[in-house]
Amino acid sequence: MVGADLSGIELRMFAHYLSHYDHGRYGEILLNGDIHQVNADKIGISRKLVKTVTYAFLYGAGDEKIGLSYDPQLSPAKAKQKGAEIRQAYLDAIEGLEKLVNEAKEKVRTDGYLRAIDGRYIAVDGSHKALNYLLQSGAGCIAKRWMVIANENIKQLNIEAHQLGFIHDELQFECNPAHADTLMFNLELAAAQAGEYYNLRIPIAAEASTGTTWADTH
């Protein structure tokens, strides 16, 4: 078996959209530094916590949930207050983030939809979901295009392989053992090609591995 996962696809989509406002700064740190540590230093919380806050923020968590991630013992009111403070500190720490969020929310409030990276209309039933829908739709488009390109390359290169699964941002194949290395290279290359297909402003990458079971390649 050969499997591959897209590398940090949500944060790469985040960097892609932020580049309109920060001239690629977030993406540069994401690729070449430690973006969670940089944000932790700015906000004044631990790296572990800022990572939790980042994904809570991107997935649309409310203030109370963010506050409880900081301290599970807080009352609902205190958690909501603390979460609001952390949210604002997070917005202030990342150049262009507040503008990105506000513009996405305004688009949803005005039109009721967003446009994905492939041009499709995405109906959004609440402005607080705008950023999450933007990033998740982008990640989904990239993952599906990655699968298409990978399979096209497999045919062109005459790799003896058969796709077993497509799980979120992961592809799994069975293949001739002699073709495993070529297939791994192809899956990593196809991820980069998927990003180029949509003219993303940050490169897309994947990490491939081989083994005899899904436990080895997942």
Name what the model sees in each region:
Residues M1-H218:
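Conserved catalytic core of nucleotide polymerization and phosphodiester-bond processing enzymes
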